[in-house]
Amino acid sequence: MPDIRCIAVVGTGAMGTGIAQIAAQAGLTVWLFDSRAEAAAEARQRLRQTFESLCGKGKLSAADAEAAQNRLRVAERLEQLGDCELVVEAIVERLEAKQELLRRLEAIVAPESILASNTSSLSITAIAAACERPQRVAGFHFFNPVPLMRVVEVVDGLASAPEVGDALLALAARLGHRGVRTKDSPGFIVNHAGRAYGTEALRILGEGVAECAEIDRVLRECAGFRMGPFELLDLTGLDVSHPVMESIYQQYYQEPRYRPHPLTRQLLAAGRLGRKSGQGFYRYVDGQPQDKPGPQPVPQAAIRPPVWLGCENEDDRRTLAELLHRLGVEPETGERPSAAALCLLAAWGEDLSSAVQRFACPAERSVGIDLLCDLERRRCLMLSPLTTPAMRDAAHALLAGDGAGVTVLRDSPGFVVQRVLAMIVNLACDIAQQGIASVEDIDQAVHLGLGYPHGPLEWGDRLGPRRLLSILQRLQTLTGDPRYRPSPWLRRRAQLGISLRAGETAAVG
């Protein structure tokens, strides 16, 4: 492949302009073209202001800012792009439009030049099918804002030559981005892996387990996400998020793991798109949330009962006993709870009603606790339909005794954190099982592209593959929903006691 020194960006919206910025800063000559005659010139002027701003903030020297600006060229006709070694299209997400553009470019650029699409939702194979030389077409999918989101998906279509992807990976490194390589499949890596977070949170909300503000709070404070799922949906806008959910679900022929929720369709129909419309899951004024519910208040408990622990293993018992000790309580040590005891049950992948049966405890005096949470920041409790208000308040007040937050949920298999994290890890395992990308690229793409605290496979190793397998199996049993069926990748590695990042042995030496 030719050394890439000169590129063109076709389509000068936010994405195209961002790609042009990082390319010019990396020393490449960049041609800008847009079907709207003045748009490319306007993009060049915006980039001049961007470079001046970076210079003013000390992030770019005056000489580098001027050099980057001088590398930008405006093309009035596609024919002016003939000397480019790479053309990146960032035009409207319509298959026919992209196919027509690439057909025209094929007749202009050199035979060895690369044609790349920044599509986020269309098939690279389908785009390339309109070309005489589909082997030189690949995906080069950036994320907004391009200069800050330092990951780019390099997508191999069915006909893409391997050296084309190799060249794009090398270019990504020159641009200061982490290139991740993926097969052409719905959602590629990032939009595919991202289906678990929002859809499972919507399911939890739809089941009445908790309100959206409490679900957001739990996932931020207990699991370490930067934003809760409903905050994120409001930020992105349901006019963007819901069609992506629908698209990937349909492209995978109604695979239950990707199933959207009717609630987002209803909000979309009502025009409640999120921040941009002033109302979504929350209400906004000038982009700022209004009347957002605060944490659940700590009750004044009428009783302070003794505490008996129901745990599946000694590690769980030790974790709970140490927590109670810090709160000034020593748990009962008998095999059965005393007549007045609060039964605190560490449930995994099941609802409290099921845990009560398994531990043979009185449901009226039982409360579940999620040990997958960060217990230093927030404790997540669960009630059964029979838990008395007195025991609910006693458990809440006790576990809030050191100032940590407490969230009380209605009965639900897997609380909130267990369900969401198990689905995220399981979906990443399925991506690995399908051979869409390497385990390293899956983790890097999700960590950098979605901002999760860890890559999903690394996260699964931290949580424990066997524990996650058990959670998913119980969720599937209790709900009967095939969306929770464990990926073979996860099941096999849990059974063998190995890392989720362990690859497959080749069938042929």
Regions found by a protein language model. Give the residues of each.
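Rossmann-fold NAD(P)-binding glycine/threonine-rich loop
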Residues: 100-151, 156-170, 341-392
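NAD(P)-dependent Rossmann-like dehydrogenase/reductase catalytic/cofactor-binding core
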Residues: 2, 177-184, 212-509
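Structural motif
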Residues: 10, 18, 33, 68, ...
